[in-house]
């Protein structure tokens, strides 16, 4: 049983442009409080039968709460009774997961069959309830097989997911609610080939074809999210995301010195990304332009006296799909030194990822390159 609570602050938003004669606006900080409760059960039953050797089972029940609240940056000035108060926003995630792994290995092959079920509820309440309550159910069946030959080792894995996501989207202007239900299956496959080139050097080559359905956030998001500074809009018509990944890895170890290097290329069809509209105007197709204009149309109506979009200062961002290619590498090398009172380990590593859409512009929100030093 785990219970974790934390509080952290998100930096002040940047100051907005102020017209001449306007009173300066105080900065605003968003504080987040998380509360996570998890109950886990794991076990194993030794069958020792003709077909099944043992069964590993697991059960997990988790409740996660994230509360975002606002605090004005200027604490010295007295509070203005007419000033707008910000109510907290509460994000709730309740999930139940259970499954089992059946070991059916024999003297020639290592084999496992895995079944798993997840039932997850997501809901948001408060001032920034930018998504209606949504539910996701996933049933997974997987098969893994491994064979060690004299010259190399082969690993193969296959997975079938049956997924159902249900939710709704509320029209910001008219208040109409549209209900959606996504019920589909995905298939994934992965294989790797490994070989020892010498007593100290080994190589592993892998290929994977993966399919992923959009999450409830990507499907049903529709509203302001102050923590990201965006008015985020999902798309219930998003399709599955498929990727093909090729990677090659080298490992070396001798006399306390170790090193590894990995290179990969990943082609993704219908990659799902949150795109800021002001950076995507020229690339949008006709259907996407209509959706984009709808977001800006709300801002225009607010200027005319209405208030369908209460946060026109936020960047309008939409979940979209476009083919993309990822490539990158990572490596690490180091050495261990035996000391009188222990072992000293020194290492250096670096990882780099490049990601571009098919038309050449960069995929947003990709982790920057980093160097890692350790002692």
Regions found by a protein language model. Name each.
Residues 33-208, 253, 260-263, 325-336, ...:
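Face-selective signature of the C-terminal outer-membrane beta-barrel domain
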Residues 19, 162-175, 181, 199-246, ...:
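Surface-exposed extracellular loop regions of Gram-negative outer-membrane beta-barrel proteins
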Residues 31, 237-239, 321:
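Short Gly/Pro-enriched turn/cap motifs at secondary-structure boundaries
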Residues 1-4, 9-14, 21, 252-280, ...:
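Glycine/serine-rich loop-strand microenvironments at binding/catalytic pocket rims
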């Amino acid at each position: 049983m785990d219970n974790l609570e934390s509080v952290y602050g998100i930096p002040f938003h940047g100051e907005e442009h102020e017209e001449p004669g306007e009173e300066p606006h105080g900065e605003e900080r968003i504080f987040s409080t998380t509360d996570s409760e998890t109950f886990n059960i794991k076990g194993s039953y030794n069958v020792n039968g003709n077909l099944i050797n043992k069964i590993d089972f697991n059960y997990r029940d988790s409740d996660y709460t994230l509360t975002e609240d606002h605090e004005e940056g200027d604490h010295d000035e007295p509070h203005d009774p007419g000033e707008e108060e910000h109510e907290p926003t509460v994000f709730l995630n309740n999930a139940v997961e259970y499954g089992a792994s059946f070991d059916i290995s024999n003297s020639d092959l290592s084999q496992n069959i895995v079944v798993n079920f997840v039932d997850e509820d997501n809901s948001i309440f408060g001032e920034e309830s930018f998504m209606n309550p949504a539910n996701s159910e996933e049933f997974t069946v997987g098969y893994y097989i491994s064979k060690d030959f004299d010259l190399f080792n082969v690993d193969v894995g296959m997975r079938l997911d049956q997924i159902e996501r249900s939710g709704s989207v509320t029209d910001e202007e008219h208040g109409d609610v549209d209900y959606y239900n996504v019920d589909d299956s995905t298939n994934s496959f992965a294989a790797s080939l490994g070989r020892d080139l010498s007593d100290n050097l080994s190589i592993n080559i892998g290929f994977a074809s993966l399919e992923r359905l959009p999450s409830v956030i990507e499907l049903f998001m529709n509203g302001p999210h102050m923590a990201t500074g965006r008015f985020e809009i999902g798309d219930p018509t998003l399709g599955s995301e498929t990727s093909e990944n090729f990677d090659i890895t080298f490992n070396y170890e001798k006399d306390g010195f170790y090193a590894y290097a990995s290179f990969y290329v990943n082609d993704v069809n219908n990659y799902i990304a949150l795109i800021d509209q002001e950076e995507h105007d020229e690339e949008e197709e006709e259907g996407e332009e209509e959706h984009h204009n709808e977001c800006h149309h709300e801002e225009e109506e607010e200027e005319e006296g209405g208030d369908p979009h209460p946060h026109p200062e936020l960047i309008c961002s939409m979940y979209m799909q476009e083919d993309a290619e990822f490539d990158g590498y990572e490596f690490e090398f180091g050495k261990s030194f035996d000391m009188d009172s222990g072992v000293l380990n020194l290492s250096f590593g670096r990882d780099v990822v490049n990601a571009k859409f098919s038309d050449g512009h960069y995929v947003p929100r990709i982790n920057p390159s980093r160097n890692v030093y350790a002692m």
